[in-house]
Each structure stands twice: as structure tokens, then as C-alpha cells.
Swiss-Prot record:
GO terms for biological process: genomic imprinting; regulation of cyclin-dependent protein serine/threonine kinase activity; small GTPase-mediated signal transduction. GO terms for molecular function: GDP binding; GTP binding; GTPase activity. The keyword Transcription regulation does not apply. Keywords: Cell membrane, GTP-binding, Lipoprotein, Membrane, Methylation, Nucleotide-binding, Prenylation. Signal peptide: none annotated. This is GTP-binding protein Di-Ras3. It comes from Homo sapiens. GTP binds at residues 44-51, 63-69, 91-95, 152-155, 182-183. A motif (Effector region) lies at residues 66-74. Gene3D superfamilies: P-loop containing nucleotide triphosphate hydrolases (3.40.50.300). SUPFAM superfamilies: P-loop containing nucleoside triphosphate hydrolases (SSF52540). Belongs to the small GTPase superfamily. Di-Ras family. Pfam families: Ras. It is found in: Cell membrane.
Length: 229
């Protein structure tokens, strides 16, 4: 009877431990590894695929329907050779209607992803105001914060923005550049891996046109062995 009672308590304890957040478990077993917050801000006009991109990255599922977004934050705990990161990715809608919120998000951001749709030229043009806002807020420390210009929907044949157009814009803004497809999962995971290992340089290499089965050369050089936990 006593053994049965003990077994029941042990099972309850194990069940509770399984429900503990990964963060608490890591702190219990790896107290020597400091967990750092890393905030990535994703911005773009309505319909460019920001929410779909993040949903694809977080769950591996493609979201077909469009859901208007003001601001959402996705959280993920990552472990890599540099330590343990608490990754916070904020999906922020560009535009003048929520400029105060944008300023707050930019001030706290460690990295920025500027997303446009290759099927609509105006979505690239409208990113300029947000890029200038980042420059204004970060000021002389701008070089410390990686910025990646991302052309989404690269799988769509009806494009208005050529690969070279996006690359040229990235050169002008001195930021990294890559094209992705959230729908076909091209370069989605590589994008966020690159951000975690990206080091800002005075000059930025351009992405070479790549095959679907290959990752960009810039990403390959920056990609570290990170484990999603």
C-alpha cells in the first residue's frame, strides 16, 4: 500500500515537472548559462505576408488567410554556441497611424526585418519611411543593429520588383538582403538563423540568385548551429 502511494506521488511530481516552462528547466540545470533577450522587429505594409512568415517560422504551417495585424509578438527559446537566447519577434504594421507604438518597438529592438512583396512595388517604396525612422532613433549606434531587407512571395510569377531592384535598395540602405517564400518555405528558417548570427559590416554583400534547394551564400557564411528548444 505504501509503495503504491509513493508511486502515485512520484507520478504526480513527474507530471508537474513536464509542465514546467522550458525557461525554468534551463535555469535549474544550466545556471551558468545566462539567458539574454533578443528582440527582432518585423515590419511591412498590410498584405506583404509578415504574419504568414512568422506563423510559418513558429509552427511550420502556412497560413492561407490574411489576418490584419497591429502588433503581435512571437517568443521562442533558442540555444546556440553563443549561449541561450529568449527570442522575441514583433510583427509591427508600418504606417503613420501607429507611429508612437513603432517608436517604442524600434527603441527596444535589437534587429529589424523589413518585408515587402515582390508582387507590389509600392510595398518596397513604403519601407523607406520606416528605415529612416530606425536611423533616426538608433542614431550613431545604427551599425550595432542588423537590418535585413526581405522580398517575400518569391514563388509568385507575377512580380513587380526584380531581384536586382531589392538588392540595389539594400545597398543604398547598407543592409543585408534576401528573397523568401513563406508559402513554399524558401529561406524562412535561414532568415532567422542569419539574424541571430549576423554581424553588421560597413559594406554588405548582395544575395546571389539561388536555387530552391540551396541557401544564400551570405546566410551560409553566417549560419551557426542553433537548436530550437
Amino acid at each position: 500500500m505504501g509503495n503504491a502511494s509513493f508511486g502515485s506521488k512520484e507520478q504526480k511530481l513527474l507530471k508537474r515537472l513536464r509542465l514546467l516552462p522550458a525557461l525554468l528547466i534551463l535555469r535549474a540545470f544550466k545556471p551558468h548559462r545566462k539567458i539574454r533577450d533578443y528582440r527582432v522587429v518585423v515590419v511591412g505594409t498590410a498584405g506583404v505576408g509578415k504574419s504568414t512568415l512568422l506563423h510559418k517560422w513558429a509552427s511550420g504551417n502556412f497560413r492561407h488567410e490574411y489576418l490584419p495585424t497591429i502588433e503581435n509578438t512571437y517568443c521562442q527559446l533558442l540555444g546556440c554556441s553563443h549561449g541561450v537566447l529568449s527570442l522575441h519577434i514583433t510583427d509591427s504594421k508600418s504606417g503613420d497611424g501607429n507611429r508612437a507604438l513603432q517608436r517604442h518597438v524600434i527603441a527596444r529592438g535589437h534587429a529589424f526585418v523589413l518585408v515587402y512583396s515582390v508582387t507590389k512595388k509600392e510595398t518596397l517604396e513604403e519601407l523607406k519611411a520606416f528605415y529612416e525612422l530606425i536611423c533616426k532613433i538608433k542614431g550613431n549606434n545604427l551599425h550595432k543593429f542588423p537590418i535585413v531587407l526581405v522580398g517575400n512571395k518569391s514563388d509568385d510569377t507575377h512580380r513587380e520588383v526584380a531581384l536586382n531592384d531589392g538588392a540595389t535598395c539594400a545597398m543604398e540602405w547598407n543592409c543585408a538582403f534576401m528573397e523568401i517564400s513563406a508559402k513554399t518555405d524558401v529561406n524562412v528558417q535561414e532568415l532567422f538563423h542569419m539574424l541571430l548570427n549576423y554581424k553588421k559590416k560597413p559594406t554588405t554583400g548582395l544575395q546571389e540568385p539561388e536555387k530552391k534547394s540551396q541557401m544564400p551564400n551570405t546566410t551560409e557564411k553566417l549560419l551557426d548551429k542553433c537548436i530550437i528548444m
